[in-house]
A protein has these predicted regions:
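Residues that define the transmembrane beta-barrel architecture of outer-membrane proteins
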Residues: 1, 14, 33-39, 84-90, ...
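Short glycine/proline- and aromatic-enriched beta-strand/turn motifs that initiate or cap beta-hairpins
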Residues: 1-4, 131-133, 137-141, 147-184
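Transmembrane beta-strands of outer-membrane beta-barrel pores
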Residues: 3, 22-28, 62-70, 112-116, ...
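Gram-negative (and chloroplast) outer-membrane scaffold detector with strong preference
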Residues: 6, 13-66, 185
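Repeated loop/turn-to-beta-strand initiation elements of outer-membrane beta-barrel proteins
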Residues: 6-9, 98-106, 142-146
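Outer-envelope beta-barrel architecture signal
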Residues: 12-18, 52-58, 102-106, 128-132, ...
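Membrane-embedded beta-strand positions of outer-membrane beta-barrel proteins
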Residues: 18-20, 58-62, 94, 108-110, ...
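Extracellular loop and loop/strand-boundary signature of outer-membrane beta-barrel proteins
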Residues: 27-30, 76-82, 117-124, 177-183
Length: 185
C-alpha cells in the first residue's frame, strides 16, 4: 500500500509504502535448523531520487518466523544457536530501484536479517545473515505518465504545530541462566 506518486501525500512521506510479507528460508541444514517461514509487516521508502526512474530506497521487516528445529539435548544437540520453534524476525535492506517499464522495477541491494527468541528459551545466540538482494517488482496500477514526470523536491504544505501523546504498553519474559556450585555451566 502506498500513496499515489507525485501527490502531496507521497511527497510528504517520501514514497513510503507498507504491507504484509511472507518469506521462506533455507540455511542448507534443515535437519539441524529447519526451513523457517517468516510472516512480517514491512515498511519502506525512498531515501534519494537520482532520476525519474532510479532511486535509493530502504525497507525494514518485523515479524515472526516458524518451523525452526530448536536445540534439544538428545534429538538436536548440534544446534547451539536457536532454542525455540518460533522466533522474532527482523530485517533491514537498502537497494537501488530502477523503473524498467510502466509495469516492472528492478531492485538491487543488500539486506541484513536477525532471528532471535529474545532469551525466552536457551540457547539463544540468534542467527544473523547478510545477503545480496535482487528483485523484480510488478506494478499493478502505475500510470504511463508517472515515469515521464520529473522528480522535484517535496513541497510539503504547512503543518499546524501541536502536541500529541502516545501511551505504549508492553510485556516480556526471559529465561535467566544461573550457574550452581559443581555445575558445568
Amino acid at each position: 500500500f502506498q500513496f499515489r506518486p507525485h501527490t502531496v501525500a507521497d511527497q510528504a512521506y517520501i514514497g513510503a509504502y507498507q504491507g504484509i510479507g511472507v518469506g521462506y528460508f533455507n540455511f542448507g541444514n534443515p535437519e539441524e535448523l529447519g526451513n523457517p517461514l517468516a510472516v512480517y509487516l514491512f515498511q519502506g521508502g525512498r531515501i534519494a531520487q537520482f532520476s525519474p526512474r532510479i532511486s535509493l530506497n530502504y525497507e525494514w521487516n518485523f515479524g515472526a518466523s516458524f518451523d525452526w528445529r530448536p536445540y534439544d539435548d538428545y534429538d538436536n544437540p548440534e544446534n547451539q544457536i536457536i532454542g525455540s520453534k518460533v522466533n522474532a524476525y527482523l530485517n533491514v535492506n537498502f537497494y537501488l530501484k530502477w523503473a524498467l517499464s510502466r509495469k516492472f522495477d528492478l531492485m538491487i541491494g543488500a539486506t541484513g536479517s536477525h532471528f532471535s527468541n529474545g532469551n525466552t528459551q536457551y540457547p539463544n545466540s540468534g542467527l544473523n545473515t547478510v545477503d545480496c538482494k535482487v528483485g523484480l517488482a510488478y506494478n499493478l496500477n502505475r500510470r504511463a505518465d508517472e515515469l515521464a514526470q520529473s522528480w522535484q523536491r517535496p513541497i510539503v504544505p504547512p503543518f499546524p504545530r501541536h502536541v500529541s501523546y502516545d501511551l505504549t504498553l508492553f510485556g516480556s519474559w526471559r529465561k535467566k541462566a544461573v550457574a550452581h556450585e559443581g555445575s558445568s555451566g
